[in-house]
Amino acid sequence: MNPSVASLICACGIAGLLYLDREKTVHSSRALWLPGIWIVMVGSRPLSQWLGVSPAGNEQLDGSPVDAAAFGVLLAIAIGVLIRRKSRTRTLLLANWPILICFLYFLVSVTWSYHPDVSFKRWIKAIGDLAMALVIATDRQPVAAIRRLVSRIGFLLFPTSVLFIKYYDLGRAFDDDGMPMNTGVTTNKNALGLIVLVVSLVVLWNVRSLLINKNEPNRGRRLLAQGTLLAFGLWLFWLANSSTCKACFILGSFLIIASNLRAIRRRPARVHALCLIILLAAGFTLLLGGQADVAQALGRAPSMSGRTEIWASVIPMVPNSIVGAGFESFWISPSMEIFHRKLLDLGWYPPLVKHFNEAHNGYIEVYLNSGWIGVCLIALILISGYRRALKVFHRDPELGSLFLAYVGTGAIYSITEAGFRMLNPSWIFLLIAIVSASGVNAGLFGGGKHEVPASRSRRADFHELMPERERETVHAPGGGFNAI
């Protein structure tokens, strides 16, 4: 098929899926464009790459001015939205004190970074991840916001990835070892697998909800749209061939489905047992059985020696085991050069070593940049996030299962990938799940079904620009976490 014809069909297909998935009873804020654009940028390619703009100077240190400007504008607008929603924002920030402490420590760690200016700029971008999670969680209809936002991201990125892979060179590339890989709208196969993972979990959750709840409005056409999107996701998992992401999706899907079984959801102890079994199974699989995929991604033979060589070489390189090298600073410090020379001495492929800038383990990555203090803070976030998601599960098993899936897959994914880094979809969706779960547990959102009448939809965006106290005098606060 001619690529131009395929592009036209793809565009029409995306428009058709958006039309089928529309919900007339849901009127989310226009502010959702902010996290939508943010996630598309971090989940696909930098804006500078789409525009064909080459960064000036040292890309590792300076980055792209175009990308910095885009992220800065989105962050500034998001902060403005959160200020307008100050009551809900304050409640969520206080409820998520482990995340606040972690970000404050990251800010302090900028002071001992080898490049404090670069580290501080990266911390500002990291704040953007949290700000986007708060924009979603403070929406009038937060669950509907998650459904709509993630679905639209999938409608845009999934078909376009297939188009790029099948009909254009944009979706195919070669790794540093000369092996072909499918990248779709992203820069490498692991990035493609990751964005497919975080989107497909919500899509699967949507499909299950539509299958179970037969009274949903426009159920048939929405089920067709979500089912098609899920099929695209499964196809892209196969094309990307990222075993870590496939394993996380299987485990996350199993958690969503199994935890909603009557025999499990009525027994809290069984939910704990299910989560523990999944976590242990994933850990043993990735550490003992999944080494072939990780080694292949690193250009090594499928043996455990590849990963252990990386870890054994990089861990002693940390300048201070307690506080680390400084926020996002290890890979721009002299320790990186020492680490590269050590890998070369071990016989690693030089072009691969040259571009090596992560430990392929999220926990070790945090240790390198933030030391044991950072690792403990990440562990605190995961534990508190699990507890909050479990409390939501007791109130609403359907919603709680999604939050549990994101917390679980976030912890599992970081066993073999740097999943706790800024501008990483795994980290962003982990924040969304934890912040949203905190909103439920804090009683910030009502539990009944909430629909915005059509007569109010035209005023919704005007109200969004008003101070929160004034808006509450105009209409009752909305947004039920149990309502769709």
Set out the residue ranges of the language-model regions.
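Alpha-helical transmembrane segments of multi-pass inner-membrane proteins
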Residues: 1-3, 7, 75-80, 103-111, ...
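A membrane-periplasm/extracellular boundary helix in multi-pass inner-membrane enzymes
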Residues: 165-170, 237-240, 253-304, 312-319, ...
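Long extracytoplasmic/lumenal interhelical loops at the membrane interface
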Residues: 294-312, 323-370
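A conserved mid-to-late transmembrane alpha helix and its immediate loop/hinge
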Residues: 233-236, 242, 347-389
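Transmembrane alpha-helices of multi-pass inner-membrane enzymes
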Residues: 10-14, 35, 249-254, 271, ...
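Hydrophobic transmembrane alpha-helices and their immediate junctions
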Residues: 97, 207, 254, 258, ...
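Interfacial loop-to-transmembrane-helix boundary motif in multi-pass membrane proteins
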Residues: 27-35, 89-104, 136-162, 217
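Loop-to-helix entry and N-terminal half of a specific, functionally important transmembrane alpha helix
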Residues: 36, 221-231, 357, 361, ...
